Amino acid sequence: MNDEGSTATGRRSPLAKVLSALPPGTQLVIGGTVLLGAASYAHLMAAGYSLSKPNMASVSLLWTILMSVGLGLFFPVEQELTRIVAARVVGGQGVAPVLRRTLVITATMLVVLTGGMAVAVRPLADTFFDGRTDMVLALAAAFVAMAAGNVTRGVLAGLGRFGAYGTQLAVDGALRIAIALGCALGHVRSPLVFALILTAAPLVAVLVTLRPLLSSVRPGPQVAWSALTSGLAPLVASTLLSQVVVNAAVVSTQLLAPDNAALVAGLLNAVVLARVPLFVFGSLQASLLAGLSSTAAAGDRAGFSKLLGRTCVVVTVLGLAGGIPATILGPWLIQVLFKADDVLGSLDFLWMSAGTLCYMLAMVLGQALLVLHRHRLQLLGWALGTVALIVTTLVPGPIATRVCLAYTLGSLTAVVCMFAAVRLTFLREPPAAQSGADQSARPSLVDTV
């Protein structure tokens, strides 16, 4: 019996070995991430079948701007908060001062962001939402909800409360699915209602997990403002630029062809479909980052290089597994799943799928640079990728082809730059020379949908 048990244990699949090595509750985080990712598809499918093309285009643009600007601004707050809280927990210090000052920083960011939107409400409404100022207000509310979720998840992850973290993701996803399907079955035709789902669901999820968060927050020594802000600026800039690269296609199309609502909506559907591999990769990213950080901290050059290479292989397989079916079936699938018009071809999906593969590779290499404390080199890679995207978008030609190809070339440029940066950094000094590299491993998981 014991021999058989040992044999069975030794023959576990690689995925089972990875899951067993994760901290308690992390599997719930993965489950919550999966549910939240599925919610994006359900939300957009319900909107696609319920709304007119112009109204669906407005929802598509709001979703894209939220995923670009919102994630770019507030996900870095979650990352830095997780890192600092986790360090305090290890040192036996309370995290209440960290939470208070992070709330001040986040509130300041929200005031600047929403204040700017209030000043420019009319131009924003005319440019993106067919003149509807209520959609601008819905976008501002969604920014507030996203910020609340990122701050609370940052603290929960740093405290090791992965069960509550996963619960927040799961509640958010379940509510988005339930409300969106309810709106579709109830024949709701208002884009505002579908937009407000992005505010209501995450706020309820935050309230559900507020009690375990507050019960774990203890008083402690004050934290310096510089400790919270020193790494935040380059991280925010890098994340914003990376979100520009991955989400620019929809906004670029709206700016280049404001009267083509069908193309705007169809491109969002294509982006969501082509990003399925990115969504899968995001649910496993934290464990991969932890491995890179531990090998770097131990000075294990061979282990660091081997793990980074294997991660790139896994990402490539994911990209091909999702990209080939998307290229072949994508034009048909977006019509069936999202009720999109016949506005995109297989070549467009080929570029989108290739862009997703390159984008995932850039994410892996960018995280390696963070582990090696090369934040500015990561920022440089995304900056050059954004330049390549803009240049390609402005080249004459069919709009759909330009914006899809721009995604590919922008991501490819970032990959090449970051590969060179990792290579040069790794040759100059071993990972062990990077003191505190293990702090770059963050227990919170990333939403790519």
PLM features per residue range, with description:
Residues 2-6, 20-78, 233-256, 448:
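Signature of the first transmembrane helix
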Residues 25-41, 172, 176, 197-209, ...:
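Transmembrane helical elements of multi-pass membrane transporters/channels
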Residues 2-22, 163-166, 187, 191-197, ...:
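Interhelical loop/hinge segments that connect adjacent transmembrane helices in multipass membrane
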Residues 133-137, 166-215, 384-388, 400-426:
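Hydrophobic alpha-helical transmembrane segments
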Residues 145-167, 350-381:
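Membrane-interface junctions at transmembrane-helix termini in multi-pass inner-membrane proteins
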